[in-house]
Design a protein with these regions (language model features):
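Histidine/acidic residue-rich metal-binding segments in metalloenzymes
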Residues: 28-31, 153-166, 182-198, 218-365, ...
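Alpha-helical scaffold segments that flank or form the walls of functional sites
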Residues: 60-191, 239-255
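Hydrophobic faces of well-ordered beta-strands that scaffold small-molecule active sites
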Residues: 40-42, 174-175, 199-205, 257-259, ...
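Short acidic/histidine-rich active-site segments
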Residues: 49, 315-319, 367-371, 397-400, ...
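Single conserved hydrophobic/aromatic residue that forms the stacking wall/gate
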Residues: 1-12, 444-445
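An N-terminal structural lobe/cap that precedes and organizes the functional/catalytic core
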Residues: 10-99
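Active-site-proximal loop/turn and secondary-structure-junction residues that shape catalytic pockets
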Residues: 179, 205-207, 261-263, 320-324, ...
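Histidine-centered divalent metal-coordination motifs
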Residues: 43-47, 317, 445
Length: 446
């Protein structure tokens, strides 16, 4: 009723202070407490190079729809790409080489079909907050919006990358980084005294854990090079190399790790067994699923102990099936919009992994996210089994993630947490974003 009683343009106008705040309690909590608090975006996919270089985008399509990297891989907001594909837009306008103006037109024409999808509000709010546009984007308004946004992007000092971050009152950004990354751009950011917010790397060792996926042996060669070795000849060499890289990340300000797993495994094995499995795969043979789980469990326990030692938070993102469209995944590569919710049941394995770390008092602070909302209650009950006096809320139920990152999904996640744990100790939301415009909600009510 709140939105039906107003034109959508009016909903986004700056004077509408109560957008999304539909009760006196919500208004009180936001305006009197939350509105002026800084944002700590502890998990995102924003490229640190663009922060250091203070990139100025040429047009709104570059910001929203991305493009192709020099190495041929693709970058951009796959949420928007999925909207376009669902509206029948040919791929050449999405990740292809069509002119940016034409790509933007196709997105604008698709957006009105997205009522009920958070993309609709996200897009129009970004136009309102950062560009002062109080209309709504569609095929008819695309030219007007294109010209307005591009003029501001090219000339407004507040619309460089750093300008967007600063005006959004962002205090902390946690990027997502591979263990082999030299963190060059993080070093440059740390050395630049004009950057007032903190940008910290996060340790994402998926490629060193996924022994059963293509490219593992090649990646281990790169990990060896990162620690000054010709090769990693044994499992001790692997754990030593990972420890070396974790310590380097910690020196660079790393506060968190992140693990993107199909499911969380737990299968015990001796060091000798795991070494044999590693040697087998490095020799070009294929390991069984059970062998992969033994290796993964061994590495995860080792990493968990290092995180605890160094005060790094361990994050698990699981229950996602990635690249399920084989043809398009082969053509475009990962993280291009062909992933789905999985239904793996691994609550017992999560508990066993935490218990193994807890046995030696080396369980780190942990945040657990599942892409399947059906796991929320199970996660909520796992938390209470491993809390202790080290810190309130040591084990966290991660915020609604990815396909659950909308009003219904966030309410359901917080309701589960509140009913099974302590909502007051929740670490809160993050952007998980690849876009510098994703801090919109911090400015809606200013």
């Amino acid at each position: 009723d709140y939105y039906a009683s107003r034109g959508l343009g009016d909903v986004y106008k700056r004077q509408d202070k109560e957008f999304m705040l539909q009760s006196p309690t919500a208004q009180h909590l936001y305006h009197d407490y939350a509105a002026d608090m800084p944002i700590c975006d502890y998990h995102c996919h924003i490229p640190p190079r663009e922060i250091y270089e203070n990139r100025r985008f040429e047009n709104i399509a570059q910001v929203w729809l991305g493009g192709r990297n020099p190495d041929g891989s693709y970058f951009g907001d796959h949420y928007k790409w999925r909207v376009m594909r669902s509206n029948g837009v040919p791929e050449e306008y999405i990740t292809g080489d069509k002119p940016d103006r034409e790509r933007f037109q196709k997105f604008a024409e698709a957006l009105p079909m997205a009522i009920g999808n958070p993309m609709y509000h996200w897009t129009n709010l970004e136009l309102h907050v950062f560009f002062g546009y109080d209309g709504v984007l569609n095929g008819d308004t695309a030219e007007e919006v294109w010209n307005l946004c591009n003029d501001k992007l090219q000339h407004d000092p507040k619309l460089t990358v750093r300008g967007l971050i600063e005006q959004s009152n962002v205090a902390f950004i946690g990027t997502t980084d591979d263990p082999i990354d030299d963190l060059y751009w993080h070093k440059k950011i740390k050395e630049d005294s004009t950057i007032k917010f903190t940008v910290a790397p996060s340790f994402r060792p998926d490629k060193a854990i996924n022994i059963n996926k293509p490219g593992f042996a090649e990646y281990m060669g790169k990990l060896a090079a990162a620690v000054g070795k010709e090769k990693l000849a044994c499992i001790n060499c692997v754990t030593s190399a990972l420890t070396d890289r974790i310590e380097f990340f910690a020196e660079m300000g790393c506060r968190a790790s992140d693990h993107g797993l199909d499911y969380i495994p737990y299968r015990e094995a001796t060091k000798e067994e795991v070494n044999a499995i590693y040697q087998k795969v490095m020799a070009g043979e294929t390991c069984t699923p059970e062998e992969a789980e033994k290796y993964q469990t061994y590495i995860l326990i080792h990493l968990g102990k290092q995180y605890h030692r160094l005060g790094i938070v361990m994050q698990f993102h699981y229950n996602c099936l990635r690249g399920v469209n084989r043809k398009m995944n082969t053509l475009l590569g990962p993280d291009t919009g062909y992933d789905m919710i999985n239904t793996a049941t691994c609550g017992g394995e999560i508990a066993a992994l935490l218990s193994a770390l807890n046995d030696t008092d080396e369980c780190p602070k942990t945040i657990i996210y599942s892409l399947n909302p059906g796991d929320d209650a199970q996660i909520g009950t796992i938390l209470g089994c491993f809390q202790n006096s080290e810190i309130p809320g040591k084990i966290q139920h991660g915020s609604a993630w990815w396909f659950n990152d909308h009003k219904i999904g966030m309410e359901e996640q917080m309701s589960r947490l509140a009913s099974l744990g302590l909502l007051g100790n929740f670490v809160g939301m993050l952007t998980d974003s690849r876009s510098f415009l994703s801090y919109t909600l911090s400015l809606i009510h200013i």
